[in-house]
Structures are given as structure tokens and as C-alpha cells.
Amino acid sequence: MAGADRPRLTSRRGFLLAGAAAVAAGTYGVTGLLQHEPKDTSTAKDVPASQASREITFPLTATCYLAQSSLPPVATLARYDLVVIDHEWPHRVPLDYFIQLRAANPRLRLLAYVNLVDSLSRLGTARNWPDSYALWQFRTPSSSRFPRAWLAHTAAGVLVHEYLDLVMTNLTDVCPSVGGQRFVEYAADWVTGRVWPAGIWDGIYLDAWGDTLWTVDQSQWDITGTGHDVPNAKIYGPGNPLDRGLTSGERTMRSRMPDAILVANGTRTLHAGLLDGLVWESFADPLVHRDPVFDLRGYVTAGAAAAHRRPGVSLTISSRRAPAGSADDYRRARFALAATLMQNGFWAPMGDDYGQPMYYDEMDGAGLGRGYLGHALEPDPPLSVITAATDDGTGSPAPYVYRRDFEHGIALVNVGHTAQHVALRRTYRHLSGITDRLVNNGTAVDLVTIPAQDGVVLLGPPSSP
């Protein structure tokens, strides 16, 4: 699909699947690069970033780029610390693209986007979707031999959907076996045997991979294939068949990819040492009926928990949902980033869809550079620290206002419904903005007013960067 003709889909799955449904064999390439045949990626084993380049300084920035027709220029993606792209891209573009990306930003982490939950009924050509053809067992763009036994359905044969009209797979640990495998075993084999060997990835983003599903269109279904429906309350949630199935898949992936970053949806239960962290779509966004207080508390708690693999990787995703360049656009961006800074997550702002990476003053300090705030003074702060009343340092300086301190500045976020005045006890200064000069005006302050559902990043004393 041409970018101008692509429907505006703010859900990452909806955007990605709109591209996956394209049947045309269109040429894939990198914006700004000559298009030619993809190179063999078998020599790319040294591409992932080294541990030495991954010192955690803040803010941590990300993009979740799911367009299927082209990748942005290297310089665009290299602005971010973490990049998510579809798992098929190593088959479509030259290996040089990824080598240049690493060279441009050595601390960048590259994750493959994978969805094992929503089965596909249509794809593009096998040349452009080879891994998806293998996973879903396609013979032609519209003909698949994927086993019905691995699809979720009721005892009466009614197919189960969790997202739009896409039939959900059966990832439980009691799914019927086909060829001696349950679907979760087959899926883990595919991730470790087809996606990971491309050699360019730092990790995998398992989208829709959660044991608590809120949008399934059936209240019960036949998880065992024996003709007996099981109520949802006995399928989903910690300790139930879906959780156990996902956990077995995570164990397989972790054992075969011990150093890989593995992240899953915010609805996933963390089990010790398996996942690195969670992904929060539409994080703290009241425009899509997310409760900012609930989201922030869950995000901070999950990041501080011992269950995820250390040091942990979490991701919050925000869609613009406001006129570009408007005061509301900038307020929403400040709010989402400041909330993300209350823990160690990467923040991914997206535009009208998941093919529009966004960038705001606060992400690099309006030109100060990556990680301009430096290290956090309280690593992995628990919720009890973030919410503790305080008039200085990390904590809560006013009702529903939270603060976190860094080497070179502070972040404050107001998740409440009323403006709050916050005394700072020392002088800080606003960023000297490029895009938003109204708030980021470079002025020195020792008292700030933070409007409802807004945030601010302030720099430390003038001697700091």
C-alpha cells in the first residue's frame, strides 16, 4: 500500500495487519536508499549492540514502526534507543541498512515484532513474507494449511476472535497436538528457528502475548478439542491454561535465546527470569479510556518487580491523537514521557498511525543529546518511593504529582485532574525548546505549576549539561 492510501489505524496490530493483507508483490525498500535484492543475513551475527554500549541514561526513547512498504532512512531510526520493526524486514532490505543503523547509534536495541495470537487468512507474496508463510503454513497468498485444531473455537465450532475478525490461536498448555506438538511449542520453534537466526535482532516483541484477555468474543471455548467448552474464568489469568502455555513458550525461547530481550503485553503475568519486561500501548491515555493513575502504578510496580530478567526492558507507546504541533499535542507528549520517566521504560511516541515515528524536545533535551538527564538517582524505584510525600527529591511533592531525580535534572508528572503548584527548593531551568517554545522556554524556575495530566522535564544547575 502507498502511504497516502493506507487507512489511519492507531492500533499497532490494525496498522500492521493492513499491510499484511496486501496481495500485491510490491517492491520493498528503505526510504532514501536504492532498492535491490536483500543480502544473506547469515553474516550478521556481530550486528547486535554490545553490552558496553547499553549504559542506562535517560530518557530512553523508542519507536514501534510497523509500516510494511518501506523503512525510514537510517538517520530517522538511529535517533531512538529502541526500535521495533516487523520480523520480515531482514528478507526485504540489504544487511547494510542494519549495519549502518548500529554504527549510527551503538546503544540502539532492535526488536522483531511478532504476533502469534491473531492468525492470518491472507498475505502478500512468499518472497516478501517468507517467515509468515512458514508460521501460518500458506501455499498461496490466500490459501493456508494451518491446522484448525490450533485455532480457538467453541465445542459447536464457532471460531473465537480476540481482535477484529482475526481468529485467535490456542496457546494454552492443553491445546490439541498436531504432529506431536501443541501450537505454543510450534510457535516457540518458529521464533527461535526462523526469526532469531536472521542475526540482526537484540530481542523479540511478543504482541498480544498476555494471559488476561479482555476482548475475546466468546465467554467459553473448547481449549482441549474434546467437545467441552471451558469458561473464560478458567482459561485466562495467572495459573490457568493460557498462562501455563505462554510460560512454557517463554521457557523454550529463553533457553534457546538466553541473551535475547523478550517483552510482551502489559496484560502478561511476569514469571521469574523469563521476560525482560512489558509493553504498554496507549499508556496512561484517557482519550482511549485508560486510567493514568492505574497505568502509572502498574507500570512502576512491574518495573520494580523482581520477576523480570535484569536489568529489565519495558516500553510505553503513545499515539498522538491531537493536531500535530498543537499545545495539546505537546502536553500529551510531556505527560506520557514524564510518566514513563517514573520507571526505567523506553517511550515510543507515534503519530496518526504506526508508520509515523515522532520526536519531541524532551527526548534529546532539544539538542542536548541522547540520555541528557544522565543516570537515575534511584534505580528501579518501587511505587512506595514514587508515591511517598516529599518536598525534595524523588517522590510525591503534591497530590497526584510524582517526581524522579536524575544526575542532570528532574521529571515531574501530574496524573490528577487539577493543576498543582510545586516548590523545588533549588533553581532548575526549562529546556530551551525547538518545537515547543511556550513551555520549553529556557527560563530558570524554583516553583512550577503543572496543569492536570501534564508533565515537565527540568534541567539541573547551569554547570550540568
Which role does the model predict for each range below?
Residues 1-10, 21-27:
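N-terminal secretory signal peptides
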Residues 2, 20-23, 42, 47, ...:
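N-terminal cationic amphipathic segment used for targeting or macromolecule association
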Residues 3-4, 11, 360, 365:
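N-terminal leader/targeting segments
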Residues 7-14, 36, 44:
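Twin-arginine (Tat) signal peptide motif
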Residues 14-34:
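N-terminal export signals
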Residues 29-52:
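C-terminal segment of N-terminal export signals and the immediately downstream linker at the start
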Residues 47-463:
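Glycan-processing catalytic domains of CAZymes
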